[in-house]
Amino acid sequence: MLEAYRQHVAERAALGIPPLPLSKQQTQALVELLQNPPAGEEAFLVELLTYRVPAGVDDAAKVKAEFLAKVAKGEVACGLVSKVKATELLGTMLGGYNVKPLIDLLANDETGAASAEGLKKTLLVFDFFHDVKELADKGNANAKSVLQSWADGEWFTTRPAVPASQKLTVFKVTGETNTDDLSPAPDAWSRPDIPLHALAMLKNPRPGIEPDEAGARGPLKQLEGLAAKGNLIAYVGDVVGTGSSRKSATNSVLWFTGEDIPFVPNKRFGGVCLGSKIAPIFFNTMEDAGALPIEIDAGQMDMGDEIELQVDEASGKVTALKNGTVIAESQLKTLVILDEVRAGGRIPLIIGRGLTTKAREALGLPPSTLFRLPQNPADAGTGYSLAQKMVGRACGLPEGKGVLPGTYCEPKMTTVGSQDTTGPMTRDELKDLACLGFSADLVMQSFCHTAAYPKLVDVKMHRELPSFISTRGGVSLRPGDGVIHSWLN
């Protein structure tokens, strides 16, 4: 396994990207090696276990979590990983298969404190919340400290806030960049492999952009040159992210401008995206990924410029300076974005806020004042369009009422359609969210884009994706069953 893995590492390094995360089979082999390590490989094996296994409810994560749980409980002896170390590693896996073992370990004298620390930063606990509360009610001190930490929002306050001022190096793409420039359709097959797919970003020559290999490999050398200046790179454009809604476009931008998610292989978050105009869906996808998207005049920002970005957290005013001179001013879309960035994304913020609310209710505490609340627009009494009423109905508003533009709301989705060029990415996102069952009434997966001329990766997807959807209570069509829209209608 190690020999084959090192060969894979070398092949990927030649492309300038990290190896793929470990598969279920590789993780099973790794677990066996950890219990009987070849001489000289000990540190490498622990590093692989720590950093190269996916988190959430991936198949490989299950193998890792089960092994660590056995070590932590003393059921398996492993000289390289102590009980406490195993518990700490369980605490880095975000949610899913690690949660139950961590809760079991709370009552253990040796590992209780370490498992409490892990759970304090784990948001994806879902129904296991009740197990922690039950333990706390029985007087378990570790469970009490977890509940108190969730109530205090420590998962949020221990993360860095958006800096009031930060230095950025500008990666400027003039004119309009659409999502096909960032995530080309002919490269759709590689989208779930974020670092590999990112090589195709901006691969076609355009003013100011120098692809390493025109039509095949994007401007990596140019980006490396900018990174050498030592600042975060900001993606800056005149019009950014128009066209088809593609999470893969955000993934590619973040691969070059974001930061690694700790303990999660080949995923990044954060980064700054500045555009004179940013397309709404792209803007939202950036928010989900913990980036800071800001609409601001980018006319005086040029490739390679070092700028200072100042954000006033009280008013949401944004100022961009070059050489100490103000070159543009703007306003954050909403102050809540500052919380989204701090939480590591809009989705972690929504889930985390919910967890904090639940914990405070369980402890009989008043609602938290930790988070910024969105300011919703006032109703001018002008009536609502049908679309506004439909969203209003999904948000539980009374009949005839609608949602105004600029309103913060969390609509309930009863029908979700997933098509196949994005299906594997959707699967990865669901794994990251520790999803073991869908709560929407209908989740349907189609195979209409790849049924006619499948590549090898598509054949593999046709084989594996249906069971992923159906085991979670979704409906999976078969290749050749027809177009997603006709089924949904």
Question: Residue spans of the language-model regions?
Answer:
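Amphipathic alpha-helical packing elements
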Residues: 2-31, 36, 337-350
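Short inter-helical turns and helix N-cap capping residues of alpha-solenoid HEAT/ARM repeat scaffolds
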Residues: 38, 78-79, 108-111, 140
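Generic amphipathic, hydrophobic interface segment in small proteins and small subunits
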Residues: 31-48
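Short N-terminal amphipathic alpha-helices
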Residues: 41-46, 57-63, 437-445
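Fe-S-dependent hydro-lyases/dehydratases of central metabolism
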Residues: 92, 98, 102, 107, ...
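Structural detector for internal amphipathic alpha-helices that build alpha-solenoid repeat scaffolds
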Residues: 17-20, 43-59, 73, 80-95, ...
